[in-house]
């Protein structure tokens, strides 16, 4: 899905697997021994912890550190990854100083979907929720999950729907529904539907 064109020493040029899923982004260097700080795209970063290697894709221009940035896609072996406050920190094999870590700033992290561990009961990967239709208990359609976001202790569904303006013009709007048991009744991945205790005028 895209090969690397150049990379600093120690980074292995690669390409993304067909089932690659973006799971996080490198925020910055952490410490002076090559560690990086990561913002995971999930409140449960178990997929990151279970993988022995990660695919990194070069950051978009606005996220580039301005120096030593690689291009394309590289594959790095993970020596260690662990939680740190509300982020994840990780150390890659062969990346042993702060300069090496800073060269990765802004990089997008991908993993093959097939490598994800099986989610526990009532736990879901964000990628499996995006695109699901959302209805309330009365069967009223509320829209489709476009994205998710994290707000402290829980995730929030970003549900896109079509609204009518006063002049009758249809516009795309968005409603935010907390992904917590108080509002989420059922999640049917196979049926592509989430049932919620929510009203259209909330």
From Swiss-Prot:
Keywords from the named record: Chaperone, Cytoplasm, Ribosome biogenesis, rRNA processing
Pfam families assigned to the protein according to its UniProt record, in alphabetical order: PRC_RimM, RimM
Positions of the PRC barrel domain: 121-202
Domain of life the protein comes from: Bacteria
Gene Ontology annotations for the cellular component aspect, listed alphabetically: cytoplasm; ribosome
Function: An accessory protein needed during the final step in the assembly of 30S ribosomal subunit, possibly for assembly of the head region. Essential for efficient processing of 16S rRNA. May be needed both before and after RbfA during the maturation of 16S rRNA. It has affinity for free ribosomal 30S subunits but not for 70S ribosomes.
Protein name: Ribosome maturation factor RimM
Organism of this sequence: Polaromonas sp. (strain JS666 / ATCC BAA-500)
């Amino acid at each position: 899905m895209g090969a690397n064109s150049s990379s600093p020493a120690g980074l292995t040029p690669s390409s993304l697997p067909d089932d690659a899923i973006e799971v996080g982004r490198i925020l910055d260097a952490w410490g002076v021994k090559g560690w990086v700080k990561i913002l995971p795209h999930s409140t449960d970063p178990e997929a990151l912890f279970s993988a022995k290697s990660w695919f990194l894709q070069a950051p978009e221009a606005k996220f580039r550190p301005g120096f030593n940035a690689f291009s394309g896609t590289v594959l790095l072996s993970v020596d260690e990854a662990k939680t740190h406050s509300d982020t994840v920190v990780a150390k890659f094999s062969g990346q042993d100083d702060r300069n090496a870590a800073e060269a990765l700033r802004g990089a997008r992290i991908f993993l093959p979907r097939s490598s994800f561990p099986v989610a526990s009961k009532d736990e879901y990967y964000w990628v499996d929720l995006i695109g699901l239709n959302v209805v309330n208990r009365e069967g009223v359609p509320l829209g489709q999950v476009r994205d998710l976001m994290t707000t402290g202790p829980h995730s929030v569904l970003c549900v896109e729907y079509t609204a009518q303006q006063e002049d009758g013009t249809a516009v795309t709007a968005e409603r935010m529904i907390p992904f917590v048991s108080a509002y989420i009744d059922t999640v049917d991945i196979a049926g592509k539907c989430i049932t919620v205790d929510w009203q259209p005028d909330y």
